[in-house]
């Protein structure tokens, strides 16, 4: 039997389903029943099918619901089938290795039997057992290690993180900090990442990496691993066609070239490696990017962007990175104690210190304010088991490896259980009240189903390249996405109707986008893929000019007004000149923070910062100053305004605001439940307001200081459907499939209804008396006419580009708007 799981076959199946559920088809059926009229009503009665005919629309909805399920199944089947070969390739070599070790054990045991008498050599057998069992354990550990390496980093797919953060599947402690940054069209930065479960040692010592240590490693079996900036490793296996297939990754693919390898993220970037696995070039789809050069021993020497920005790396005699310098001379210094990074001093003078335990892992992190921001305890597998914070709060982590559960005990004592599968993907989160969130994934670690704490499920589907193609919520509302061959978004459809369409040039730059009414925004790009001109649906246009480094130097808006921009060597805006020649200037510190803004009249607003980079004081243009103080957690403790009035803030164990004390000593207090939802508010005069919630976090009750309770109800996608006041008054709300409010029924039973166009814009309001007010829009989506029930109207007129020009009211009165240009008097 021929098995066809090509994309063409999948699309054919999807079209069959689409044809069955076509709105046109069902409209034809409905029209048919209406057209045949009374002549066949008797047949319906005799056949007892009148109810089915009357309910044809409801039946169509059932078919649509079934379509959602069928389409989801088709997407899932094809994704799963296409993943079979990939999954087989990804594990076969490791499983064969493990199996070979087991076979070797059997053969070795057989060799310990004396062929003459059948007796075993017990001493030899003991040695064989110890050696071969260790080999089997090592093979199994290699498989597990490969999976864990995929889950390193700040954003491991399918995993959740705690506050500091800790990976709630693997127990990995994650830390990151950006020490130096150069902005502009092609940003450069020195960004450090730490993974407690990363066993490798590099130029930053144990477990640390920086963002340009992306590298490629080829294994003996032909598998290629790509270590990303944050430490995560993605593996690519070579198939029979010689192509490298991502083991558990979406979108990216690896290509072998004569020079080495290229990692391609379609529509975004390309990373080139040499044969030794060193990253040589990182560039966008227009070829603009960063080049990397290395010392003879293979260590990174320089990262240089095409716009002239650069970072230079210097090492000590132990081959540890000790200095990073940008092209303007700003420097980051790194200090070590043995093989461990001890301190980092940034260009602004901020210092970050690290202390380690006997296991070589970070036990304390000291921030730039000389506050120990976290203290860590680990188990023997380098997993976090306890954390302590500056306010004395603690978090604990308990691991049930047999059942694949991690229990997090929060700072407020609440316990949340995270359940993971054999690939460390979070498949279930269990809360103290017994409610659960559930997750399903495809073979590329993409979530295909999420069920919330109320049992409501949202489903996602992806194409074979990993692009999201459909979401279906708990009320069967569908959003579909299509892409071109380079994974650029082509269209968005909601409930079967296309709402957005995009167009691209050969390089993948956006050249236009249009809505379902054909209103289009066109984009003209330069050779580097930068927008030069944007033309809107009304014919108005925006023009943009750039300097040689790719910075915007001139912007001509739709009204013809021109603003120009000046930059420093770090591509930071240092001045702007508006259409009236008013100049505003900006100054920065070594950490790229604005320290002063000087307006056209010479008035200055100044900012000062604490060592952690938070604003301490603002001296305004009028010379008056406002200030902030912070607690050890870095949260605002006091705010003093320009009049000297001070507001005080306190926080609970979960770092929620627990009280606010105003300058007049009026105090509001706040109490939260175990899910950090506000449940009690004490007002300055002593009154108390309480709140209740459902498992999804929707507010279901509010009781005011007088004891009056208002209740709220919601539908399956968390839209408010009913408000029940304390006096029994009831207000109900109804929505269409797009989520627009279409009907509001008040306590007296009076109905206000609403209609919308296909872009979700409200087109009419009909009051309880049946009088309708209508709204009409222009091609820019701005209201151009409001027609009232008595036939009168308000008319809005706009300039090109959408700026309001005039308003004419029903009584004939009007308003006109214009731009007043200021010209300096002649001397």
Describe the residue ranges of each PLM region.
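Extended charged/polar low-complexity repeat regions
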Residues: 168, 196, 206-210, 215-824
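Intrinsically disordered, low-complexity segments enriched in small residues
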Residues: 111-115, 119-196
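Membrane- and interface-active hydrophobic/amphipathic segments that mediate membrane binding, fusion
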Residues: 1-147
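Short, solvent-exposed loop/turn elements at domain surfaces
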Residues: 198-200
């Amino acid at each position: 039997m021929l098995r066809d799981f090509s994309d063409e076959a999948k699309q054919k199946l999807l079209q069959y389903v689409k044809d069955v559920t076509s709105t046109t088809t069902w409209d034809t059926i409905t029209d048919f029943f209406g057209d045949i009229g009374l002549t066949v009503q008797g047949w319906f009665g005799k056949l007892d099918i009148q109810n089915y005919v009357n309910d044809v629309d409801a039946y169509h909805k059932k078919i649509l619901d079934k379509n959602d399920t069928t389409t989801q199944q088709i997407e899932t089947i094809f994704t799963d089938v296409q993943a079979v070969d990939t999954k087989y390739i990804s594990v076969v070599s490791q499983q064969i290795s493990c199996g070979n070790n087991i076979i070797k054990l059997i053969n070795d045991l057989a060799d310990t039997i004396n062929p003459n008498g059948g007796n075993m050599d017990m001493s030899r057998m003991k040695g064989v057992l110890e050696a071969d069992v260790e080999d089997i354990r090592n093979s199994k550990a290699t498989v597990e290690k490969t999976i864990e390496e995929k889950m390193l980093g700040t954003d491991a797919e399918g995993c959740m993180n705690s506050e500091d953060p800790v990976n709630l599947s693997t127990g990995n402690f994650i830390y990151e900090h950006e020490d130096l940054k150069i902005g502009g069209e092609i940003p450069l930065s020195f960004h450090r990442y730490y993974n407690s479960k990363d066993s490798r040692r590099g130029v930053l010592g144990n477990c640390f990496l920086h963002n340009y240590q992306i590298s490629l490693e080829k294994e003996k079996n032909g598998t290629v691993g790509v270590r990303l900036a944050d430490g995560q490793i993605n593996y690519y296996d070579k198939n029979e066609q010689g192509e490298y297939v991502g083991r558990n990754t979406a979108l990216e693919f690896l290509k072998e070239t004569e020079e080495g390898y290229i990692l391609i993220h379609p529509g975004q970037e390309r990373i080139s490696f040499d044969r030794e696995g060193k990253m040589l070039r990182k560039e966008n789809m227009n070829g603009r990017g960063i080049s990397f050069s290395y010392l003879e021993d293979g260590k990174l020497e320089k990262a240089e962007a095409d716009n002239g920005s650069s970072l230079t790396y210097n090492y000590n005699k132990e081959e540890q990175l000790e200095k990073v310098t940008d092209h303007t001379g700003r420097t980051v210094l790194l200090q070590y104690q043995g093989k461990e990074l001890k301190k980092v001093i940034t260009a602004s003078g901020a210092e970050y210190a690290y202390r380690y335990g006997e296991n070589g892992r970070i036990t304390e992190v000291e921030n730039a304010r000389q506050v120990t921001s976290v203290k860590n305890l680990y188990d023997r597998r380098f997993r976090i088991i306890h954390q302590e914070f500056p306010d004395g709060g603690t978090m604990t982590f308990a691991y049930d490896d047999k059942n694949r559960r991690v229990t997090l005990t929060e700072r407020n004592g609440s316990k949340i259980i995270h359940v993971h599968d054999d690939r460390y993907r979070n498949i279930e989160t269990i809360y103290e009240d017994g409610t659960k969130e559930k997750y399903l994934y495809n073979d590329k670690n993409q979530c295909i189903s999420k069920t919330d704490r109320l049992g409501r499920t949202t489903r996602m589907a992806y194409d074979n390249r990993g692009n999201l193609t459909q979401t279906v919520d708990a009320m069967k509302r569908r959003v579909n996405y299509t892409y071109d061959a380079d994974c650029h978004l082509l269209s968005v459809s909601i409930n079967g109707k296309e709402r957005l369409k995009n167009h691209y040039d050969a390089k993948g730059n956006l050249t236009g986008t249009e809505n379902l009414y054909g209103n289009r925004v066109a984009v003209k790009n330069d050779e580097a893929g930068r927008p030069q001109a944007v033309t809107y649906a009304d014919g108005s246009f925006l023009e943009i000019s750039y300097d040689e480094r790719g910075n915007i130097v001139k912007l001509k808006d739709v009204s013809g007004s021109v603003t120009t921009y000046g930059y420093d060597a770090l591509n930071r805006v240092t001045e702007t000149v508006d259409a009236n020649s008013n100049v505003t200037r900006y100054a920065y510190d070594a950490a790229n923070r604005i320290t002063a803004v000087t307006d056209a009249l010479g008035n200055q607003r100044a900012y000062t910062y604490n060592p952690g980079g938070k604003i301490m004081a603002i001296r305004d243009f009028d010379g008056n100053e406002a200030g902030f103080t912070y607690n050890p957690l870095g949260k605002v403790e006091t705010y003093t305004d320009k009049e000297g009035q001070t507001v005080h803030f306190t926080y609970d164990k979960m770092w929620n605001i627990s009280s606010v004390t105003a300058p007049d000593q009026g105090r509001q207090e706040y109490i939260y439940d175990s899910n950090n939802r506000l449940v009690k508010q004490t007002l300055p005069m002593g009154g108390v307001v309480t709140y209740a919630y459902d498992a999804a976090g929707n507010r279901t009750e509010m009781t005011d200081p007088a004891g009056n309770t208002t209740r709220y109800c919601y539908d399956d996608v968390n839209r408010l459907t009913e408000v029940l006041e304390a006096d029994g008054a009831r207000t109900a709300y109804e929505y269409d499939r797009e989520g627009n409010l279409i009907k509001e029924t008040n306590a007296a039973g009076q109905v206000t209804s609403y209609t919308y166009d296909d872009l979700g814009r409200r087109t009419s309001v009909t009051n309880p008396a049946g009088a309708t007010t209508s709204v009409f829009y222009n091609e820019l989506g701005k209201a151009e006419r409001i027609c009232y029930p008595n036939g009168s109207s308000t008319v809005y007129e706009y300039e090109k580009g959408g700026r309001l020009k005039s308003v004419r009211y029903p009584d004939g009165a009007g308003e006109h708007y214009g731009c007043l240009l200021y010209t300096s008097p002649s001397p």
